[in-house]
């Protein structure tokens, strides 16, 4: 991996990790909302998860790293759980979707560190 590729992969992976963590946290708050607020929250989170899935698919296409595709598959599972109002389990599945993305970040960090860029 070239340093240029490492920078791109590191950036994409770290951004994905932050997005996944944010959405996982938001999913845990849905059960605490008022009944009339839950459908709107569910809609917004579903849309954000769909955007995240598309970002992961795009990252896989740009970088060639299958780990981003695995993360997209994990987000698909999260979307299925959200559709059946299983927000707690969906939040846990977000954590699982973050594992392959973390591997990309670690690999890229190793290259950047070896090149003394970090």
Task: Give residue ranges: language-model regions.
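Long, charged/polar, soluble alpha-helical segments
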Residues: 1-118
